[in-house]
């Protein structure tokens, strides 16, 4: 009897393993671990709504419509914009309002998988007022009058726990974004300030940005690729090695997570990254990333101390 019961349980586990992924792939809204997935690939006339949570990654699956120009393999950033409501059963199209006007420091990353845009949306860690944004998909043939979309409700935020000392995230912005576009503490020009230094402590969020929201910057790149997942590291000396940040701070979190998807085309548009330093750091360390512009570099150095200064 017991052997028969074990055999039945084993059979049930195999069935769940085989069939659950297929079943989940046909759900419109999926929550798995720390992911919320809006699946508009299989629901091309649908929509989703979610409240943003920094502990969850929000993903949108959009079908690639063949009659569109997708040669550069990027998800068009103008497809994400501030939500202005529904009129006559259609979403109000506000694509002219660039997403950075609403959320300076937002990141969109995209991977192409099975003729599908696999988009991840990372709002910044400072949001000055409650806001709702939408990201839309192209309409498929036969559904031209219907716009599939994901709606994201984002609450006013002042750091992860309202713990910022100022109004901005600690970090180096070699895009020199200022005024309404400012989101990092140090907007700088690499031509006049090739070195930017940040002091950080356990629990801090730090950032880097290489992109200007107002001026086209030729040949901009964030190095090492995948920063802050990968960083140049030193124990407060000037001898650096490239390593995964979790080798030196095991509980550190980085946004976006591009470790498994190098060469992400949308990340080359946004050129922004954040690092959440864990609440416990064993020792003082030094890391850096840089913004590269056709061989010229802006160096962003982060001195991370194990304890806060008294």
Curated annotation (Swiss-Prot):
GO terms for cellular component: cell surface; plasma membrane. Residues 25-157, 168-309 form the 6-Cys domain. Disulfide bonds join 38-48, 62-137, 80-135, 172-196, 210-291, 227-289. It is found in: Cell surface; Cell membrane. Coiled coil: none annotated. Keywords: Cell membrane, Disulfide bond, Glycoprotein, Malaria, Membrane, Repeat, Signal. Disruption phenotype: Cells lacking both P36 and P52/P36P show attenuated infection and do not form a parasitophorous vacuole within hepatocytes. Glycans are attached at residues 72, 114, 118, 290. It holds the Pfam family s48_45. Its main location: other. The keyword Cell membrane applies. It comes from the Eukaryota. Residues 1-24 form the signal peptide. Involved in sporozoite infection of hepatocytes and replication therein. This is Sporozoite surface protein P36. It comes from Plasmodium yoelii yoelii. The gene is P36.
């Amino acid at each position: 009897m017991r052997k028969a019961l074990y055999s039945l349980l084993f059979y049930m586990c195999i069935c769940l393993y085989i069939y659950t992924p297929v079943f989940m792939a046909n759900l419109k809204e999926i929550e798995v671990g720390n992911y919320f997935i809006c699946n508009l690939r299989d629901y091309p006339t649908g929509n989703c709504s979610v409240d943003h949570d920094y502990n969850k990654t929000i993903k949108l699956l959009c079908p690639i419509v063949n009659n569109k120009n997708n040669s550069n393999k990027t998800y068009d950033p103008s497809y994400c914009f501030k939500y202005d409501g529904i009129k006559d059963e259609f979403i109000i199209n506000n694509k002219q309002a660039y997403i950075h006007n609403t959320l300076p420091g937002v990141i969109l990353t995209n991977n192409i998988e099975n003729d599908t845009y696999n988009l991840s949306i990372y709002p910044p860690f400072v949001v000055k007022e409650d806001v709702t944004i939408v990201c839309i998909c192209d309409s498929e043939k036969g559904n031209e009058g219907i716009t599939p979309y994901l709606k994201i409700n984002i609450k006013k935020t002042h750091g992860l726990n309202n713990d910022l000392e100022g109004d901005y995230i600690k970090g180096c912005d070699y895009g020199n974004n200022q005024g309404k576009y400012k989101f990092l503490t140090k907007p700088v020009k690499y031509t006049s300030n090739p070195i930017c230094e940040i002091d950080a402590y356990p629990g801090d969020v730090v950032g880097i940005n290489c992109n200007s929201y107002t001026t086209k910057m030729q040949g901009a790149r964030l190095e090492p690729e995948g920063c802050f997942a990968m960083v140049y590291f030193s124990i407060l000396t000037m001898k650096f090695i490239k390593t995964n940040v979790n080798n030196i701070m095991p509980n550190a979190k980085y946004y976006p997570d591009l470790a498994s998807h190098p060469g992400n085309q949308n990340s080359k548009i946004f050129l922004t990254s954040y690092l959440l330093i864990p609440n416990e750091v064993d020792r003082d360390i030094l890391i850096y990333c840089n913004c590269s512009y056709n061989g010229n570099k802006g160096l962003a150095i982060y001195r991370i101390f194990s304890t806060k200064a008294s």
